[in-house]
């Protein structure tokens, strides 16, 4: 069941990157 955690982390990383990009656009 190690792939579940890996998938979760990958999704979190993608979300974080999207938020950072949006933040930069707002600035």
UniProtKB/Swiss-Prot annotation:
Has weak antifungal activity toward C.comatus and P.piricola but not toward M.arachidicola. Inhibits cell-free translation in rabbit reticulocyte lysate system. It comes from the Eukaryota. It comes from Benincasa hispida. GO terms for biological process: defense response to fungus; killing of cells of another organism; negative regulation of translation; xenobiotic metabolic process. The lineage of its organism: Eukaryota, Viridiplantae, Streptophyta, Embryophyta, Tracheophyta. Keywords: Antimicrobial, Fungicide. This is Alpha-benincasin. Coiled coil: none annotated. IC(50) of 20 pM in rabbit reticulocyte.
């Amino acid at each position: 069941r190690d792939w579940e955690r890996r998938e979760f982390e990958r999704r979190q990383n993608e979300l974080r990157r999207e938020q950072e990009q949006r933040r930069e656009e707002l600035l």
